[in-house]
Amino acid sequence: MDVSTKLFGTYFATHHGLVRTRELLAFGYDDERIRMAHNYRLLVRVRQGWWALPGTAEILLRAWRAGGRLACVSALAFHGMSLELGDRLHIEVSAGSHGALKPGMCVHWSTSQANGDRRAVSLEVALRQASRCRVTTTAPPR
C-alpha cells in the first residue's frame, strides 16, 4: 500500500466513510482521478455526489442511498447494542427530504440532525427514537 492510498483511507476515516465529491476535489482529486478510482473499484458511488470505499458496511450504504443515516434500533445495533432488529432498516432523514421511502425501511423524520455523524444518530438520540418508534410510521410529521 503506497502513501497516497493510506492518506486516502485516512481521509475517508476522518469523514466516517462517506465523502462528498466536493470534499474529494478539495483533497486534491480532480474529476478524472475520481472517475478512474471508481473505474478501478477503489471508490464506490453511493449516490450522486457521494462516495465510499469498497468494504463499507452494506447497512450504511443502504441508509445513505435512501438519503439518510442509521436511526432508532438500526443505530443502536451500530453502536454495539445487541438487538433483534427484524427486517426493517431504520433511517433518519430531514423533514424536508423527498424520495427516502424505500421498501423495508422505517423512516424517522427529523427537523434537527445535529447529534451523531454521517453514519448514524448518536446513542442518546437512537434510544429516544426507539422508545417512541411505531415501525409502521413512515410519513413526515405534520
Feature locations, PLM:
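Short gly/ser-rich loop at a beta-strand->alpha-helix junction or flexible surface loop bordering the NTP-binding
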Residues: M1-R142
